[in-house]
Curated annotation (Swiss-Prot):
Keywords: ATP-binding, Glutamine amidotransferase, Ligase, Magnesium, Metal-binding, Nucleotide-binding, Pyrimidine biosynthesis
Protein EC: 6.3.4.2
GO molecular function (one): metal ion binding
Biological source species: Parasynechococcus marenigrum (strain WH8102)
Protein name: CTP synthase
Amino acid sequence: MAKFVFITGGVVSSIGKGIVAASLGRLLKSRGYNVSILKLDPYLNVDPGTMSPIQHGEVFVTEDGAETDLDLGHYERFTDTAMSRLNSVTTGSIYQAVINKERRGDYNGGTVQVIPHITGEIRERIHRVAANSNADVVITEIGGTVGDIESLPFLEAIREFSGDVGRNDLAYIHVTLLPFIGTSGELKTKPTQHSVKELRSIGIQPDVLVCRSDRTISEEMKRKIGGFCGVPTRAVIPSLDAESIYAVPLTLEQEGLCREVLDVLDLTDHDSDMAAWQELVHKLRNPGPAVKVALVGKYIQLNDAYLSVVEALRHACIAQDASLDLHWVCAEQIESDGAQALLKGMDAVVVPGGFGNRGVDGKIAAIRWAREQRVPFLGLCLGMQTAVIEWARNQAGLTEATSAELDAGTPHPVIHLLPEQQDVVDLGGTMRLGVYPCRIAPDTLAHRLYGDQVVYERHRHRYEFNNAYRNLFLESGYVVSGSSPDGRLVELIELKGHPFFTACQYHPEFLSRPGRPHPLFQGLIEAAQQRLPSSPVEAIQTQR
């Protein structure tokens, strides 16, 4: 039978609950326990698929095609375990399910209420993850901050959960902040005390407190916090600001987080094997020469909009003993200032995914610059589509070429709507989503990087390369290095005679892991290193 851990947050939002959940998952897995982590999000959207990346950050896509919160990316990267649509729950999806049941008559004419129906549905979702994941421990992160109206049904549900399982079968962790007041020169515990008081008022007594701070927390302060909050001093876990999120599991291990959780859950504290993770963090702290990578996007106001792309670049740099010098470049600014002005000196260019017309011409200009200047280039999703448009306009003689998404009346729709999308009306959850196989062509850059004939990648798109122009592109120098098994869909392209120019319709960033970088990103960084003045790089084949 699975054990359950619930992680709440107090004092401020963005306190780091997701990283704590992912770190605990890593520590449990290092002891031989199977782990699954789910996120309960308090917003009314059914999923984040239609939300603005500038408001919400990136949409992380699972293997089974769920559009989820970016925290699921942290869960997968830290635990190296694939999550599913069951691991992402929103208030909107809960209410939708309950209302659908009411319409079907499942409640036999009863009055449908927040308690017990909404809270019961929430508890059922948590049990469902346990039943379908074969996990020894299910970790649940509750979004929002204790005291928010939106989070109350979730908090009530996890309070009720103690009636579903034994008290030794669940643990409550509360992540909180100890602010430093400069004028008094001390950390303050009062916000934490009030946050725990709020949590206790709804019937939840935390077993462990994870206290975020930017400076050392003394033993005396830990005793004070524990005394006021009803938590043993040893269960007050300091979590100081780290130079990298990948250092957090090691810090929490040193402070005894996993030991305390296992004690509450009455589980054996097996020996932990974190050697590979320690080596990873050592490499992060002792990087080689920096490579300058330009990320050309339209949502750069919020870095989280491209979180998985940035992490994939970091993973590749770790593997290549390089330091990532990331330059955020606004695609719209390229339209006004020119690519040369903003990209000069870059060792590589990445154009990630996106939607709509805004910034597209800037992306196309960046791609042309990378192609003509022979700078390593990687395009992702819309990045591939804009690479196709750039080639069509500047090399294939189709000066009016574009995507049907951008101009439905274009005479040359080199990118067009997938046939199965023709009659789709709703926006949410209707794209080509999830894992699909891709057949890699022999004697290509892609085959050298992947070292395999068939790979499986995650997708999120409605538009695809228009095969009516396929022969024209092939004749003019484009290489289709990856396609669907039936050959119908172009999934991966590259250019002959360029040091590194490739673009894919899928999202390889979702499959990159700290100790196992994605081949396309590692290949990009390896190619970028070749541009450094004095940094000999081993051939990428020797890395595998």
